[in-house]
Amino acid sequence: MTTYYAHSAQDELGNLLPYEHWQTLQSHLVNVGEMAAEFARVFGAQEIACQTGKLHDLGKYSEAFDRRLHGGPSVDHATAGAKISVERWGNVIGKLMAFCIAGHHAGLANGNGEGDNRHTLKDRLALQFGADIPALDNLWQQEIKLPQNLSAPPLKPDAHHPFFSYAFF
């Protein structure tokens, strides 16, 4: 079975250290999920935050990212988790999560319109696994457990403009 890593480790001269010094991807995603949940507990969104944290680096479950850890080219590793969140939890909760996941390195992108040379979330969600972004190893589904359903965030959206309220979430 393949072990995927979130981060490599280097010595003071920049040489890669042995794998036992590297952080496994499963450990990283679970830990980030737990930390995000703690931060979001104060406003009642701990479950959404936990799952967002678990998905933020999901694209690292790929051969392309493993090559990156060994000096290969950069790899889009955030879009995968954004896509999975929308596929699993839909266009409200999943899309709120997708903005966070897709923007966790580059900042938040616009939803549909043109922005500052960043791809929109709509464009990124349209990317295809194995063609536009790296295919994921199915191992992720064994290592990262996701609930089937998530409750809506504890907001009281405006009846006429509900997404305006969600934008502040």
Where do the PLM segments sit?
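Accessory nucleic-acid engagement/destabilization modules that flank
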Residues: 1-169
